[in-house]
A protein has these predicted regions:
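Active-site-proximal or metal-binding-adjacent scaffold patches in catalytic folds
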Residues: 1-64, 73-102
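Walker B catalytic acidic pair
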Residues: 69
Length: 102
């Protein structure tokens, strides 16, 4: 429960940029242990799942993952249009993503 509260607070910082797209309804947030990714967005279920392990990453990297997953509500893939959406909110997204590789 502590981890979900933590990621909910982080998500609340990003949500206003997507409120219109989401019709004013926040997505369901889940947290679980994952080994192959930091987060997963399921637009059809209006759900984002964050990796429990993300909690131990730097805050700048955490925000990157939150923004990344929210951007999947706009673009379902990792096309140039998707990365353009990420860049609108986080011009330094590449540096933030690198933090996750350390």
């Amino acid at each position: 429960m502590l981890f979900r509260s933590y990621f909910t607070a982080m998500s609340d910082k990003v949500y206003p940029a997507f409120a219109g797209v989401l019709g004013g309804q926040k997505p369901v947030l889940k947290v679980r242990s994952m080994t192959s990714c930091w987060g997963v967005c399921c637009p059809a279920k209006r759900q984002i799942t964050f990796a429990l392990q993300l909690y131990n990453q730097p805050p700048a990297a955490q925000i990157y993952v939150v923004v990344h997953e929210y951007c999947h509500f706009l673009q379902l893939n990792h096309s140039p249009a998707f990365w353009a959406e990420v860049e609108k909110l986080l011009p330094d997204w590449k540096a933030r993503r690198e933090l996750l590789k350390k």
